[in-house]
Amino acid sequence: MLDRPILRAITPHDLPAAAELLSKALPYDHTEPVVEEKLLGSNHRRDRFTTGAFSPSGELLGVVALAGRWLKLLAVHPSAQRRGIGTILLQSARAHLTASTGALSKLRVGDHPGNYLSPGVDERSLDAQAFFRARGFVEVVRVLNLRAPVHRNPLVTPERLRKLTSVARADGYTVRRATLADAEPLHQMITGSFAPVWSFEVARALGPSLRSDATECASELPEGPAVHVALDGTGAIVAFAAHDGNNRGLGWFGPMGTLEQHRGHGLGEALLIGCLLDVADRPDGGVIAWVGPVGFYSRASGAVPDRRFVVFEEQ
């Protein structure tokens, strides 16, 4: 490349240029609504490294976002690709990781728990895959997003939600939307029985007042808290499902969980359908990200494979 880019931290002032860059560099993602969340938003581990590569005239050419050892995103404007900018940004992320955690830490691409744009490199992004392979990264796993039809789907209707809720009630359970008062019981239940990072996402889904970064996604969602819960006869929360805890505003579903001793009562289905009805009109409404139980989602909502991703890690 002729001129080495100037590297500096991304600031709120840079977000419009970053949104334009990401929309062109990452064609398979809806990036504009979540650019602030991805670049300046909080992470589960409370750390953040977000750097831009700028031309001498101040044009944003590329951006890298790192959280811990996870490379959340690396993007270069198409007009500036194949000039070494991506490599420079990757090297800056590597240097930051080495300085902060030690040389033995390995960069991992995409699947950052809690705040991720996508859980890996889209399988269709062949150039991106080649870029990482050429720089010593190897494939470690492939992951899947599903998408449930949210319109004209007999499995996703208010009538079906009422039926599922009624069945749960007959078994002694109450299914409802969560409130801010549920925040601490949810945190205790999730951290005690599921992945602690899920509590971070659920807190974000409950509402801006529970997020540590006051500038991030400051507006409430139209439906209110984006979490649905099931309570047993004692009033204890025994199941939950959330959406918009990650990629807020796009309508991504997850996480969800039911305590083992309360499974088999249709609670998960009721909570899933409640969430899918919430997100019917979002840009990515119906996306079920980073899926484990494919069969459950297929049976409960008619979800089908949508996108596949490759997760890379340094050798």
Predicted segments with their positions:
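Short hairpin/turn module used for nucleic-acid contact or packing/dimerization
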Residues: R263-Q315
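Acyl-donor-binding surface of acyltransferase catalytic domains
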Residues: M1, L90-R169, V310-Q315
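A short, internal acetyl-CoA/4′-phosphopantetheine-binding micro-motif in the GNAT/acyltransferase core
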Residues: W70-R83, H112-N115, M256-G264
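Conserved hydrophobic beta-strand within the GNAT/NAT acetyltransferase core sheet
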Residues: L71, K106-G110, P119, F253, ...
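Conserved acetyl-CoA-binding loop-helix of GNAT-fold acetyltransferases
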Residues: R82-T98, T258, G264-L277, R299
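Short amphipathic alpha-helix that is part of the acyltransferase structural core
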Residues: M1-K38, G52-F54, E59-L60, V143, ...
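A conserved beta-strand-loop-helix scaffold within acyl/acetyltransferase catalytic domains
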Residues: S23, D29-T50, G62-W70, F194-T258
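A structural microfeature
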Residues: G62, V141-L144, V238-A239, R307
